[in-house]
Amino acid sequence: MQPIQRALISVSDKTGLLDFARVLAARGVEILSTGGTARLLADNGLTVVEVSDHTGFPEMMDGRVKTLHPRIHGGILGRRGLDDAVMTEHGIPPIDLVVVNLYPFEQTVANPDCDLETAIENIDIGGPTLLRAAAKNHASVTVVVDAADYERVAEEIQSSGGVSEATRFDLAAKVFEHTARYDGAIANYLSARAESEAGASFPRTLTLQFKRRQSMRYGENPHQNAAFYVEHQVAEAGISTATQIQGKELSYNNIADTDAALECVKQFDEAPACVIVKHANPCGVAFGATLLEAYDRAYQTDPESAFGGIIAFNRELDAETAHAIVERQFVEVIIAPRVSDAARAAVASKPNVRLLECGDWSREPGDRLDFKRVNGGLLVQDADLRLTDQIRTVTERTPTEAELADLLFTWRVAKFVKSNAIVYGRERMTIGVGAGQMSRVNSARIAAIKAEHAGLTVAGSVMASDAFFPFRDGIDQAAAAGIKAVIQPGGSMRDAEVIAAANEHGMAMVFTGMRHFRH
């Protein structure tokens, strides 16, 4: 193992740097540095050689040119035992450790007020060059791009004076992952800007990078391998930010279903709400005066399907609700923004139940993209975050205030049901859910069947449809079940026929002007 004798340190994020640099100084490592990093180290009593003194060439062009010099890159790229003679001939001392992180380009362009000039000035040139050079020559050079690695590198240096081959290789791979992401972010930004000026909504090339959070026993089915990857900077509370408090390891299906349940319940903030999901579809959703009441009412919609389901809440999980769940049913996952200590103790009686806490979320989620893999390609779209374009009554009868509240409730639920989606509801509780049918009228039939099977009365309820009714048969079916009001996007060639059917049955019907297909 080759000892670390000389290090180059130049960082934008100085988290943890002083402690790491002190370890190097204590081992007698010579430290080369630039600009603000050099000042920080010197101000804290560490001996530093400015890169400009090392190269005999000043920093220039407002810091654009600092480390781009043969005496720096030769010291990094020189192969020990192979290039020693040429390094000696040209007076190039070897550099054994490179510690660099980059200008914060992604954080800069995330600011809506960022202009092109500011973005350009936050494109790091020297940093990626140093990192890539050191990573390429990892056989001789240790490279650190992540402050989280300072501790393990410091421990190896303190114990042996150098860094093991396995660690150097891992750190080198990490560098290329990091620079790939960095260059991808720049390419995405500039390409999107160029395409926007040309009238396009998306960049002509799209570079994405996710970090592996978890390797899984298997995927959707036991014969499929799987892993869970997350964004580097998750902007909003969700399944990717969740902390598992107890329970078995989350499976592929657990994560997919928990995401569906949580994203659905996040729509509701005006009262305690509960969403129960099975196979990515809500099988019960309800409001309540308390969290326990919300759970009880959601469970009533479809107790049979709730078995082995995922339960999500929009309020802190309390002990009373937690006790009710574990005493009543088998549940795979419970997730809430927060979980009280008493609720944790209650769920602990069922050690296999996966209990998650995701943190509070914003009532105004930021824009994001949705992706769907197809063979040989990727479908990209804006996430479906809006609810309605407008609410317009199209029938002779206007919905009552109570009906309108239920219509808007079921409309929010229908948005998360697989198409064709029909949701029956009353008093802000789902009565029946018809999901994933090829025929919309069959979804309506299934919603009525589910309600009857659960012992719930459809008469006097309302209905939401995620897309327009192509024929009047869906309205006739709903009327036969006792539905009194309907919410749907409208836009069918036969809207007049559908409206006439609603009028014949004395129904109120509103159009939203916005479809919510979910595939």
Swiss-Prot record:
Pathway: Purine metabolism; IMP biosynthesis via de novo pathway; 5-formamido-1-(5-phospho-D-ribosyl)imidazole-4-carboxamide from 5-amino-1-(5-phospho-D-ribosyl)imidazole-4-carboxamide (10-formyl THF route): step 1/1; Purine metabolism; IMP biosynthesis via de novo pathway; IMP from 5-formamido-1-(5-phospho-D-ribosyl)imidazole-4-carboxamide: step 1/1. Coiled coil: none annotated. PROSITE patterns: MGS. The keyword Metal-binding does not apply. GO terms for biological process: 'de novo' IMP biosynthetic process. Residues 1-145 form the MGS-like domain. GO terms for molecular function: IMP cyclohydrolase activity; phosphoribosylaminoimidazolecarboxamide formyltransferase activity. One of its GO terms (cellular component) is cytosol. The IMP cyclohydrolase activity resides in the N-terminal region. PANTHER family: BIFUNCTIONAL PURINE BIOSYNTHESIS PROTEIN ATIC, BIFUNCTIONAL PURINE BIOSYNTHESIS PROTEIN PURH. This is Bifunctional purine biosynthesis protein PurH. It comes from Allochromatium vinosum (strain ATCC 17899 / DSM 180 / NBRC 103801 / NCIMB 10441 / D). The lineage of its organism: Bacteria, Pseudomonadati, Pseudomonadota, Gammaproteobacteria, Chromatiales. The gene is purH.
